[in-house]
Amino acid sequence: MDSNTITSFQVDCYLWHIRKLLSMRDMCDAPFDDRLRRDQKALKGRGSTLGLDLRVATMEGKKIVEDILKSETNENLKIAIASSPAPRYITDMSIEEMSREWYMLMPRQKITGGLMVKMDQAIMDKRIILKANFSVLFDQLETLVSLRAFTESGAIVAEIFPIPSVPGHFTEDVKNAIGILIGGLEWNDNSIRASENIQRFAWGIHDENGGPSLPPKQKRYMAKRVESEV
């Protein structure tokens, strides 16, 4: 097993422990608590995969962090903060496309990871493009503002957007939501392609031809989820 993988897991466990202490002392907000719960599930899964005990990993992570802090200076911290990049905003859609009202003949919707997925299941045999507006940090999709599916004539047939009452979402949440949307639309023999920006910043794919943003196997899996859950 790679030593860096173990070290990363140990540090993640200890940092999660610190965040948990903040939560127990009512020193954090709702989005913080939401991320804490999700990360706990992720750590349990990683621990099971690696065959490592969470308690032992947390103690080892504490030693690693303490060693780093002993050699850390305030000046180094200032440099690290100053060099952190600011998010930038990517816009596939115009203001008109984002704000336009649309209606569904056969509405279907699903909530996943703090996001609402809505689609019109009456749409069949259409060529559809996905466009999105979102922020990017470290060359990866950070926060989705809105994603909409358009036919060649410009009609809106599906949409993904954050739910205001649900705190936060992650890149994986957005990718899962897009997978559900693509699976649902392709179930009715529609042809889907994602914008280059969606492919690049959500999946790290650079395809100027706008090819599929999900492998066929994953799209079939998502389609089955739509049929049974949406």
UniProtKB/Swiss-Prot annotation:
Upon interferon induction, ISGylated via host HERC5; this results in the impairment of NS1 interaction with RNA targets due to its inability to form homodimers and to interact with host EIF2AK2/PKR. Residues 1-73 are annotated as: RNA-binding and homodimerization. One of its GO terms (cellular component) is host cell nucleus. It comes from the Viruses. Keywords: Eukaryotic host gene expression shutoff by virus, Host cytoplasm, Host gene expression shutoff by virus, Host mRNA suppression by virus, Host nucleus, Host-virus interaction, Inhibition of host innate immune response by virus, Inhibition of host interferon signaling pathway by virus, Inhibition of host PKR by virus, Inhibition of host pre-mRNA processing by virus, Inhibition of host RIG-I by virus, Inhibition of host RLR pathway by virus, Interferon antiviral system evasion, RNA-binding, Ubl conjugation, Viral immunoevasion. It is found in: Host nucleus; Host cytoplasm. Its main location: host cell. The keyword Ubl conjugation applies. Residues 180-215 are annotated as: CPSF4-binding. A motif (Nuclear localization signal) lies at residues 34-38. GO terms for molecular function: protein serine/threonine kinase inhibitor activity; RNA binding. A motif (Nuclear export signal) lies at residues 137-146. Pfam families: Flu_NS1 (PF00600). The keyword Endoplasmic reticulum does not apply. Homodimer. Interacts with host TRIM25 (via coiled coil); this interaction specifically inhibits TRIM25 multimerization and TRIM25-mediated RIGI CARD ubiquitination. Interacts with human EIF2AK2/PKR, CPSF4, IVNS1ABP and PABPN1. Inhibits post-transcriptional processing of cellular pre-mRNA, by binding and inhibiting two cellular proteins that are required for the 3'-end processing of cellular pre-mRNAs: the 30 kDa cleavage and polyadenylation specificity factor/CPSF4 and the poly(A)-binding protein 2/PABPN1. In turn, unprocessed 3' end pre-mRNAs accumulate in the host nucleus and are no longer exported to the cytoplasm. Cellular protein synthesis is thereby shut off very early after virus infection. Belongs to the influenza A viruses NS1 family. This is Non-structural protein 1.
